[in-house]
Amino acid sequence: MIQPQTYSNVADNSGARKLMCIRVLKASNRQYAHIGDVIIAIIKEAVPNMPLKESEIVRAVVVRTCKELKRDNGMIIRSDDNAAVIVDQEGNPRGTRVFGSVARELRQLNFAKIVSLAPEVL
């Protein structure tokens, strides 16, 4: 579960390293974001000499959370960290690589490009 003021890692090579969530999209009073949700975040830590800079406001898709995700078949998916992939307005990833595993639910939520870049799909 990611709420405003939550720090998360960036799971791509766009140049950012840490994000801080400032808003959960898709609902007016929704408090938490789960896997597959789009958030608005601020870049808190970035790699030098890259296109994305610190204190820049970006959109990101949550790909891993510490809070478990329960599937209909009884499987539970849990990660060691909160991670997100930075996307543009159309939902395409800004980076060219995705690090770490992503959940299969992203494919059903029309983030197939993120799933195709990921090395492991759970």
Swiss-Prot record:
UniProt cross-references to SUPFAM superfamilies, sorted A to Z: Ribosomal protein L14
Q: Which CDD domains match?
A: Ribosomal_uL14
Q: Which keywords does the record carry?
A: Chloroplast, Plastid, Ribonucleoprotein, Ribosomal protein, RNA-binding, rRNA-binding
Tell me the Gene Ontology biological-process terms attached to this UniProt entry: translation
| Alphabetized Gene3D superfamilies for the sequence | Ribosomal protein L14
Its main subcellular localisation, reduced to a broad class, is plastid
What is the protein name for this chain? Large ribosomal subunit protein uL14c
Keyword Iron present in the record's keywords: the answer is no
Q: Which NCBIfam families match?
A: rplN_bact
Where would one find the signal peptide in this protein?
Answer: none
Top-level taxon of the source organism: Eukaryota
Q: Where in the cell is it found?
A: Plastid, Chloroplast
> How the protein assembles, per its UniProt entry?
Part of the 50S ribosomal subunit.
Q: Which GO terms describe its molecular function?
A: large ribosomal subunit rRNA binding; structural constituent of ribosome
Q: Which InterPro entries match?
A: Ribosomal_uL14, Ribosomal_uL14_bac-type, Ribosomal_uL14_sf
